[in-house]
Amino acid sequence: NLYQFSNMIQCTIPGSDPLSDYGNYGCYCGYGGSGTPVDELLRCCQVHDD
């Protein structure tokens, strides 16, 4: 979910703002999702959306 994603990014990249930096990234990051993921980040988001 988005909360877990946010925590993971903040742990990996201290000082980042994951929801504003990645909230609308690609077709799966953010609320809902569809389409074909084109990179590992989107595949991760797809797994958590499904």
Curated annotation (Swiss-Prot):
User: What Gene Ontology terms for biological process does this UniProt record contain?
Assistant: arachidonate secretion; lipid catabolic process; phospholipid metabolic process
Q: Which organism is it from?
A: Trimorphodon lambda (Sonoran lyre snake)
Summarizing the function annotation, the protein's role is:
PLA2 catalyzes the calcium-dependent hydrolysis of the 2-acyl groups in 3-sn-phosphoglycerides.
Which Pfam family is an annotated match for this chain, by its short name?
Answer: Phospholip_A2_1
One Gene Ontology CC term in the entry: extracellular space
Q: Which tissues and organs express this gene's product? A: Expressed by the venom gland.
Enzyme kind, highest EC tier: hydrolase
Localization (cell): Secreted
Q: How is its activity regulated?
A: Inhibited by EDTA.
Give the protein name, as stated in the record.
Phospholipase A2 trimorphin
Which SUPFAM superfamilies does UniProt cross-reference here?
Answer: Phospholipase A2, PLA2
- Reactions catalysed, as given in the entry: a 1,2-diacyl-sn-glycero-3-phosphocholine + H2O = a 1-acyl-sn-glycero-3-phosphocholine + a fatty acid + H(+)
| Tree of life domain | Eukaryota
What are the cysteine partners in each disulfide bond? Answer: C29-C45
Q: What keywords appear on the UniProt entry? A: Calcium, Disulfide bond, Hydrolase, Lipid degradation, Lipid metabolism, Metal-binding, Secreted
What does the sequence similarity comment in the record state about its family?
Belongs to the phospholipase A2 family. Group I subfamily. D49 sub-subfamily.
Q: Name one GO molecular function term.
A: calcium ion binding
